[in-house]
Amino acid sequence: SLQFGKSTFSTTHYTFTQRFDFLDFTAKLFPGSYDTVRPEGLPFVYCGVITLILLPMYFVTSRIRWQERMMSGVILAVFLICFNVNAIDIVWHGFQKPNWLNYRYSFMLIFLMLVMAYKAFSYLEYANYKNVVFVCGSLAVILMFIQKQDYEWVGDFRCVWLSLLCVAVFGVALWFVYSGKFKGRATAIVAILVCIELFTSGLLNTIGLDKDVVISSRNSYDNYMQKVRP
């Protein structure tokens, strides 16, 4: 079946080399960070700014068993190692390097992070809001540091400024949830904000994909189908 893909079968080299720098991976956690689906691309691990805020809260929430938190941290570390070590990454892809669309198991890491963020959100009222403020401040510093690296695929406005805005907005929204004021409405507002962020990120990713590999027009597809229709 590989004969009909983007390239033919190739000899796989199981070398223990590092695939990317850790800061590169961190940048991919933010919205508007589309780079490429080509072989040199990084993992697609964006799953919402609110997830990045709640993830550290998961590890400092005493209501969650320490054994669960410890094992979750171990699994996160294992995924990061699998992404970054070439030989292990190839094993995940059936012992054959993928033709484009790298790290096809990244959805598993995203699912784990979402579950952890949900648990942290569920126990947010028992947390210390100062920790949320600290996490938001840390994310802001990380974003400024990422901006300084001048990645071609990290735009000032479409990624850095958008992410900073999301950090600030979600930081305020989580305070209303934490304080219990307008709790029902506050949770609904958080859900709406998440939807707006995801729509914006999806739109930016679609634009980035079109610039990267070009999304075929409907006319070109329709012309092809007319040739093969009976």
What are these regions (language model features)?
Residues 1-71, 78-79, 85-93, 98-107, ...:
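Periplasmic/ER-lumenal interhelical loops and adjacent helix-loop junctions
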Residues 73-81, 85-87, 96-223:
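Contiguous transmembrane helix-bundle modules in multi-pass membrane proteins
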Residues 201, 229-230:
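Short periplasmic/luminal acceptor-recognition loop of GT-C membrane glycosyltransferases, typified by
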